[in-house]
Amino acid sequence: LGDVYKRQEVICVSESNRITGQKTFGLKHSIVIENGINLTKFNPHREFSNLRNEFGFTDEDFVIGFVGRITLQKAPLDFVKSIALARQKDKRIKALLVGQGDMEEETKEAIRLYGMEKHIRTSPFRSDVPDVLHAIDVFCLPSLWEGLSIALLEAMAMKKALVVTPTDGTKEVITHQQSGLIVDFGKPEELAECYLAYLHHPEWKEDYGVTAMSTIQERFNSRRVSQQVTEVYYDILR
């Protein structure tokens, strides 16, 4: 048993995560095993409940989704402002914001200040995330920093069009104008332009969504990830 304790392997979910660990903690033995997604649960071709109807969206609405903690890291105020800006150019833009956090009240106040109460629907965290993702047209992750967002991977598995910021983990999985659109940090006006681009170029929404879904199927299948973790354990115990 003593030999087991002498061997260490730190599992990191992204290459940027591993590099940060090396710089911050001096990690000597580390390996990257990316997060896994349950592709049976997050399958865009299965049946879903009609959350668009529950939240009051019509078939004509183009719904932008935000799913995550409502904290400074996730830049919810940028998201709210981006929706207001996009609606100045196309009234079909609506939004669904799902999450909780220490900026909840500030975010709701921003929604009121922009006059978006009827156009940005909010909800606390929900257990039916696949249904939430099915209900939206575009998934937005405007984070200021990020490791590797599980919510992003789930949206990719659901074949969603993506608008993201270039955080370290995100850049490892999203290629600009191939599997999503990447905009700079703190630029709600650029987020807005991306929503409108997807609305006016539906082929981008479809093509980028397919590419994102393929990335998940190839790299982030939970069964594949479980096998990789098991192999690490076996190597340590040998």
Give the residues covered by each predicted segment.
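Short, small-residue-biased leader/transition segments that mark boundaries at the very start
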Residues: L1-Y5
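A short, active-site helix/loop in glycosyltransferases that binds the activated sugar's phosphate group
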Residues: R7-V32, I37-K41
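A short, well-ordered alpha-helix in the C-terminal region of glycosyltransferases
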Residues: N53, E190, A197, W204-R219, ...
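A conserved mid-protein helix/loop that constitutes part of the nucleotide-sugar donor-binding site
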Residues: F62, F66-Q88, A95, D102-K108, ...
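Nucleotide-activated donor-binding/catalytic signature segment of Leloir-type glycosyltransferases, i.e.
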Residues: K108-P124
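Aromatic "clamp/platform" in nucleotide-sugar-dependent glycosyltransferases that forms part
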Residues: F125, L144
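Short hydrophobic beta-strand element within catalytic cores of glycosyltransferases
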Residues: A161-V164, I174
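Conserved acidic donor-binding segment of nucleotide-sugar-dependent glycosyltransferases
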Residues: H176-Q177, L181-P188, A197-P202
